[in-house]
Amino acid sequence: MDCFVANAPRNDESLEMLTKAPHLFDEATTVTAGDSRWRGRTSPDYWAFVGPFGGATAATILRALIDHPLRAGDPLSLTVNYCAPIAEGSFDLDVRLVKANRSSQHWCVEMTQGGGDVATLATAVFAERRPSWSHQPVKLPQATPFEQTLPYPSLAMSWVKQYDFRFVEGEPKFGAAPPSVPLDAYSRLWISDRVPRKVDALSLMSMSDAFFGRIFHARREMVPFGTVSLTTYFHVDAADLAAEDITRVLAVADAKIFHKSYGDQNGELWSPSGRLLATTTQIAYFKA
């Protein structure tokens, strides 16, 4: 099994990578402002089986919101509904501020291609986070340190090649004999950009969709699969993330049900220091 250990960057190489710009992720999520719409382009570096990686699409939408001149505060939540396939090439983002008050903003984003129907529909909430009482009842899941875990072998999809997945528990065993009963859909793993990049809201958004489909774990095989609707909640702002100063997250994901072609997924993204950065949930289609 090729685990890429020989190609893992040394510490000095990692530092050098962090200084290089632009990162492939930033190139893939670049948007430009037009007269009334924002424009972006799909990236071959973040491609899935039949379209762009949904996490990169969501991060691109979030970038358009963060870069918008009317934006105030930090993201609290982003919901992305993948309405139709996205073709390779350029796309337009119609970004609208729906409602704003002194502390929060509500946004709507529609993605179209070539003047056609809406391919992706998103809603977002931004807010000014103010000092308050804080309490985190949940604790960081136990995990072998990142440096003591092996990288997961790369798969055919180009987007997978952009991440370093290191499973602590629940590594998918593709190619093994199908189980007589469904296996556990739970997994715990470290996720980082293969070329190190400081974790920010954009990378959190993308990583929240970087879990392999839960059905792949339960059935020990790849089946036709696609996210229909994804929501990610952010529990830190830009200042919190800057203080964490990290390039990797500890991620956990699980599912509660697979039924009549649809299954759920819930996940958490943690900093190595034990801070819960984001939680996420989605509903996905499968054919099996």
Where do the protein language model's features map onto the residues?
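A cross-taxon signal for low-complexity, glycine/charged-rich
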Residues: 1, 7-11
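Terminal targeting signals and extreme-terminal segments of soluble enzymes
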Residues: 15-288
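Accessible peptide chain termini
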Residues: 1-2, 17
